[in-house]
Design a protein with these regions (language model features):
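N-terminal accessory segments that position/regulate proteins before the catalytic core
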Residues: 1-150
Length: 150
């Protein structure tokens, strides 16, 4: 059987995902009464739903270059920072993420900067892992300002 080539995002995910055996053996007691809010939410802006593009069958979008672009972005975000499991615990859910951490519930946030394309208007976006979507929360062409700052 020929070896399948993985994308960089899939390779990263496979090497950093939690293993149930090591997760249980290295866990420490948590104070369940002091849980932070596990998701950052932006209440303003427009949402780009990425769920339709997470399909594992790339041929579903074979004749649609725009959908292929959305599928690549959807997979990159999911495999680098998406929710990979939901475990019930003490009356509430514990979410596991693709991103490795030292036990933090949300050690990072993922943002996308768009200079503006036919598919993604210019501005700043936050990846909403709970809903697997992009929140366009800052509608401005910030690309040139960021380039000048670098």
């Amino acid at each position: 059987m020929p070896e399948l080539h993985q994308s960089i995002a899939q390779h990263y995910h496979e090497r950093t995902k939690y293993n149930p055996e090591t997760l249980a053996s290295k866990s420490q007691r948590l104070d369940w009464t002091k849980q932070p809010v596990p998701f950052k939410e932006y209440k303003i802006g427009s949402t780009f739903d990425l769920k339709p593009y997470i399909q594992e069958k790339p041929e579903a979008f074979a004749n649609n270059p725009d959908a292929q672009w959305w599928q690549r972005l959807s997979r990159l975000l999911f495999r680098s920072y998406g929710l990979t499991a939901k475990m019930p615990s003490m009356g509430s859910a514990v979410y596991l993420r693709a991103a490795p951490s030292a036990g933090g519930l949300y050690p990072a946030e993922v943002y996308v900067v768009s200079r503006g394309t036919s598919l993604l208007p210019p501005g700043l976006y936050n990846y909403q892992c709970r809903t697997h979507s992009l929140m366009h929360y800052w509608e401005s062409d910030v690309w040139q300002t960021l380039q000048a700052a670098c």
